[in-house]
A protein has these predicted regions:
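Donor-binding and catalytic core of enzymes assembling or modifying cell-surface/extracellular glycoconjugates
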Residues: 10, 170-245, 251-252
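Short amphipathic alpha-helix
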Residues: 16-23
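A short, glycine/small-residue-rich beta-strand->loop->alpha-helix junction that serves as a flexible
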Residues: 5-15
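Short, solvent-exposed turn/loop segments enriched in Gly/Ser/Thr/Pro and often Arg
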Residues: 34-41, 183-184
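Secretory-pathway luminal glycosyltransferase catalytic domains
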Residues: 39-176, 259-261, 267
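Gly/Pro- and small hydrophobic-enriched strand-loop and loop-to-helix capping segments
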Residues: 25-34, 236-267
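Short hydrophobic beta-strand segments
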Residues: 1-6, 30-33, 93-94, 132-145, ...
Length: 267
């Protein structure tokens, strides 16, 4: 058994486990996500075998007391072939770190990964109540930690987000557009978005992380600052995703990318 450990945010945990799961499937090794054994209880994986608090506690303290080894995947572009040999040979071990990457295997087992992270029925039912006809645009506004992420490069103002949304609207002049705005800014100026996007219906779902991700996954297009949250939301249905790398850049349909490309180009 390979116990996958991480302390990051939900979407990062999903991607990290996806890589280890895919490697395990390819090499007939069972894997278990320590994170989803007790946290972010929105997904099918949380109800599968081994994903429970007892398994989490066992792995945590067995590693802490040195009873099972821990492999750290912390260095980008490092050669982890020795680690892979240990993952093949050792009966029990813990793996941790963000730099585990098996892109081809992830894509090979992507359908299974999506099924593991299928949203619970209650989450889907909540989302269904918010969905309306028309072209659904999901917008993820990232603030908070983005003040320091890459030196604040992707910390955009409301004016910049609205400008990008307007560019999207101009690409679809004959469509009725629903704009679903999610994010981590509790002080977001909602009235500003409603006033500036008066030709669209603007919805602020106020969901938890699982509900927000589920809602975004049911949109037709996604827009946001580069983030694993929108990336994973796009994974479920191969949605076109526009990462705002330069808010002044003219928007075109060609600038939208899908998960299979973007997950290999994470910031």
């Amino acid at each position: 058994m390979i116990f996958v450990h991480d302390k990051g945010r939900m979407a990062n945990n999903m991607l990290q486990y996806g890589h280890f799961y895919a490697w395990g499937r390819e090499h007939c090794r069972k894997t278990m996500s320590m994170r989803f054994a007790y946290k972010y209880q929105y997904f099918h994986i949380c109800h599968t075998r081994y994903h429970n608090f007892l398994s989490y506690v066992f792995a945590k303290y067995a590693a802490k007391w040195g009873l099972i080894p821990t492999l750290h995947f912390d260095d980008k572009d490092a050669d982890y072939s020795d680690y892979e040999q240990q993952m093949l040979k050792r009966r029990l071990l813990v793996v941790t770190g963000w730099e585990a990457r098996w892109y081809d295997l992830f894509l090979k087992y992507k359908k299974e990964i999506v099924q593991l992270f299928a949203f619970d029925k209650a989450v889907e039912q909540h989302t269904s109540s918010l969905l309306h006809d028309g072209l659904r645009l999901g917008v993820h506004i990232r603030r908070g930690d983005y003040a320091s992420f890459h030196g604040g490069r992707f910390l955009y103002s409301d004016e910049q987000y609205v400008s990008v949304i307007r560019s999207f609207v101009q690409l679809h002049p004959d469509k009725e557009i629903m704009v679903y705005v999610c994010g981590n800014d509790p002080n977001l100026n909602r009235d500003y978005y409603r006033q500036q996007l008066d030709g669209c219906e603007v919805v602020f779902p106020d969901g938890n992380p699982g509900e927000d991700m589920c809602l975004l996954s049911h949109c037709h297009y996604l827009i946001g600052a580069p983030s694993t949250f929108t990336l994973v939301a796009s994974m479920y249905r191969n949605l076109p995703l526009y990462w705002i790398e330069d808010p002044a850049l003219p928007m075109t349909e060609e600038r939208f990318k899908t998960f299979d490309y973007l997950f290999q180009h994470i910031y």
